[in-house]
Amino acid sequence: TGSMLSTYFIPSTGTNFIERQELGSAANITFSDIPQTYDHLELSVYARSDVSGDVRQYGVYFNGDTTISNYERQTFYATNATVAAYQYSSPVPGIIPGATSTANVFGAQTIIIQNYVLTDRHKSTLILGGYTTRAEIQLSSGRWKNTAAITSIELIVDSPDEFEAGTIVELRGIHSTAPAAASDVAALNSIAPADIEAVN
């Protein structure tokens, strides 16, 4: 009694797939000529390094800018029961397993790049990621100290590393608003006030 279930329709025009890269061999990843028709971008990263080590790092660079001091990051993270935070100049969104980490384990991050086409402000990112064999999760915010619209994104693992084969990175565009189809509007208009009162 008193339980409620709500359902929502999310139009396919709200989030649009731009490009997917799945590596067949070790490499770094670049997205070029990014469309300037969205409000925000989302990177979905499923990655592992090809160099020995339990933990490796990679950077996310915009418009070919690889100057470390042009990026800032604030991170809150938890490893097992230990919680900590730090801030420093870095384009690194998180950690991924190295080649000697547990076999078949990949790290995962979701990176939101907000207002990437606006040219009157620095670019901000929100990052959530981690991987289970290290029992670590990270939540970060980042800033690129540049007002230029973002037209390219590079994901580069710390030298001499590259991403291992099987790494998958997807880029999507996000619209702040999405037009409703005429059929959806008609369906909404067909709801009788009495039915709404009954639900309430």
Regions found by a protein language model. Give the residues of each.
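Surface-exposed molecular-recognition determinants
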Residues: 1-200
